[in-house]
Swiss-Prot record:
Disordered as annotated region, ranges: 391-559
Assembly and binders: Component of the RNA degradosome, which is a multiprotein complex involved in RNA processing and mRNA degradation.
GO molecular function list: ATP binding; ATP hydrolysis activity; RNA binding; RNA helicase activity
The entry's keywords: ATP-binding, Cytoplasm, Helicase, Hydrolase, Nucleotide-binding, RNA-binding
Designated name of the protein: ATP-dependent RNA helicase RhlB
Gene (UniProt): rhlB
GO CC annotation: cytosol
Record's compositionally biased regions (Basic residues): 505-514
Catalytic activity: ATP + H2O = ADP + phosphate + H(+)
Family matches, as InterPro entries: DEAD/DEAH_box_helicase_dom (IPR011545), DEAD_box_RNA_helicase (IPR050079), Helicase_ATP-bd (IPR014001), Helicase_C-like (IPR001650), P-loop_NTPase (IPR027417), RhlB (IPR022077), RNA-helicase_DEAD-box_CS (IPR000629), RNA_helicase_ATP-dep_RhlB (IPR023554)
Positions contributing to ATP binding: 53-60
Subcellular location: Cytoplasm
Domain (Helicase C-terminal): residue spans on this chain: 231-393
Sequence intervals crossing the membrane: none
Length: 573
């Protein structure tokens, strides 16, 4: 970014709708930034744009002005229904979508345009009702919008006349490109639809997407002397893993009161670092995928108001968030991707302000440094880790920010936030169920979600399961300790007890409701008894005395019937 972030070109010099000019002026926007000065002359007449500029240079306002002006001065498509959206703005992350929506409402609320914010992690039905009522502009993340378009037909994009893709390179990183292509194919063809694409880097894959789905886009690049903002003072330390927290505390104690962001690489270290800072008296907020969406929004809002001193985050907050007055950005962990380094330090020194970017290159992540320096085309100055820096200075009492005491979340500690997050995640998993459920929510047997401790659904012990019988083994029901087998005659014994290969090819005996089936052998006993089965020594089977009380008459066990049926099928073949 140049030392002069604003140009001499004013918004009033363009042929904008009068209400839009008034809204911009009331919001404090009068002169254009370089990317706005390049974009608006192409986008306002209806041309497609593929724009590249650093974060914090005003890309959001550039496309919002183009979108709103088109909707105000041009009629809608002829086949549009009142509830169909006319414009779609896609962002890769929830935080960026929320930021865009906030900026849009800031100066577009009085223009008569209806905005809808659509993203995951919040009330599904509430967003669906808002879309069904009809909106002019949808600001969304791809995942939730795909669900409304594809699954439930809540919204139709056939009358969407302008589409914006913000942070297109990040769309690729997060795997959203298939979703983007799906949505673009549901809109009018590119000759009718205007498309604006913005990215911090116009890589080959981003340009491929642009030329595939855009109508002869004009490539606009804001030239800079360096990849990183010129007003960011960068420096790097080489601490050991054990020194990182102590060094962070020492540096923070030397910048009391400055709004600070600390970036780490993993969600686990977000909690660990935030807990350490909180124990030393800092008011800390956290942004990571483990924190529920509503809590993330609340913490971000408190940080923007100055009620929180430090925000510890993963790369979920590295792009698109515009937070005024961030003076220090700490890379507690060097990022794996060099582009992420640029986006992280881009949270400070926005729109001509100054800021400091301080990085720690420990033995775990120091291998990323050469790629980062090659990407930004400069060497990052190295500072020594001294004993003085490892000694935190005494903290001065912090003044209470207006409205802080009445904030509902002001008493939330880092431990409370993550404990509630874990409880919420466990409740969500329980609600989804470990296995499938039958009618009424009862668990089905055999679905894979049952208990593994031998207890039934009512908590009582189950009887042991029988081992499946292998072909050729004796039926357990015919063991000597069971009810004896009654043999009709000695001459018939071999036919009844012979091995499977020696049986006569006849229909097996079966019972239906306790009555013999036609063709079955007569039963000597007056009461129904289990059908005879082949013992281990067929030629020596004789009736044996009863050693235990006879079981009540009834059908053979399920396993016995299955085994006999299988043997009959084998012998019949």
């Amino acid at each position: 970014m140049s030392d002069k972030p604003l140009t001499d070109l004013t918004f009033s010099s363009f042929d904008l709708h009068p209400a839009l000019v008034a809204g911009l002026e009331s919001a404090g926007f009068t002169r254009c930034t370089p990317i706005q000065a390049l974009t608006l002359p192409v986008a306002l007449p209806g041309g497609d744009v593929a724009g590249q500029a650093q974060t914090g240079t005003g890309k959001t306002l550039a496309f919002l002005v183009a979108v709103m002006n088109r909707l105000l001065i041009r009629p809608a498509l002829a086949d549009r229904k009142p509830e169909d959206p006319r414009a779609l703005i896609l962002a890769p992350t929830r935080e960026l979508a929320i930021q865009i929506h906030k900026d849009a409402v800031k100066f577009g609320a009085d223009l008569g345009l209806r905005f809808a914010l659509v993203y995951g992690g919040v009330d599904y039905d509430k967003q669906r009702e808002l879309l069904q009522q009809g909106v002019d502009v949808i600001i969304a993340t791809p995942g939730r919008l795909i669900d409304y378009v594809k699954q439930h037909k809540v919204v139709s994009l056939h009358a969407c006349e302008i589409c914006v893709l913000d942070e297109a390179d990040r769309m690729f990183d997060l795997g959203f490109i298939k979703d983007i292509r799906f949505l673009l194919r549901r809109m009018p063809e590119r000759g009718t639809r205007q498309t604006l694409l913005f990215s911090a880097t116009l890589s080959h894959r981003v340009l491929e997407l642009a030329y595939e789905h855009m109508n002869e886009p004009e490539k606009l690049v804001v030239e800079t002397e360096t990849i990183t903002a010129a007003r960011v003072r960068q420096r790097i330390y080489f601490p050991s893993d054990e020194e990182k927290q102590t060094l962070l505390l020492g540096l923070l104690s030397r910048s009391e009161g400055a709004r600070t962001m600390v970036f780490v690489n993993t969600k686990a270290f977000v909690e660990r670092v935030a807990r350490t800072l909180e124990r030393h008296g800092y008011r800390v907020g956290v942004l990571s995928g483990d924190v529920p969406q509503k809590k993330r929004e609340s913490l971000l809002n408190r940080f923007q108001k100055g009620q929180l001193e430090i925000l510890v985050a993963t790369d979920v907050a590295a792009r698109g968030l515009h937070i005024d007055g961030v003076k220090y950005v700490y890379n507690y962990d060097l990022p794996f991707d060099a582009e992420d380094y640029v986006h992280r330090i881009g949270r400070t020194a926005r729109l001509g302000e100054e800021g400091d970017a301080i990085s720690f290159a420990c033995e775990r992540y120091a291998m990323s440094l050469p790629d980062i320096e090659a990407y930004i085309e400069q060497k990052i100055p190295v500072e020594p880790v001294t004993t003085e820096l490892l000694t935190p200075l005494p903290r001065t009492p912090r003044a209470t920010v207006e409205g802080e005491e009445v904030d509902d979340d002001a008493g939330d500690s880092v431990g409370t936030i993550f404990r509630e997050a874990r409880e919420q995640r466990a409740a969500d998993e329980a609600r989804r169920g470990g296995g499938r459920s039958g009618p009424g929510g009862a668990s089905r047997s055999g679905s894979g979600g049952g208990r593994r401790d031998g207890a039934g659904a009512d908590g009582k012990p189950r009887p042991p399961r029988r081992k499946p019988r292998v072909e050729g083994e004796a039926d357990p029901a015919a063991a000597p300790s069971e009810t004896p087998v009654v043999v009709a005659a000695a001459a018939e014994t071999p036919a009844v007890t012979a091995a499977e290969g020696e049986r006569a090819p006849r229909k097996r005996r079966r019972r239906r409701n306790g009555r013999p089936v036609e063709g079955a052998e007569p039963v000597v006993a007056s009461t129904p008894v289990p059908a005879p089965a082949a013992p281990r020594k067929p030629t020596q089977v004789v009736a044996k005395p009863v050693r235990a009380a006879a079981k009540p008459s009834g059908s053979p066990s399920l396993l016995s019937r299955i085994g006999r049926r299988l043997r009959s099928l084998v012998s019949g073949s």
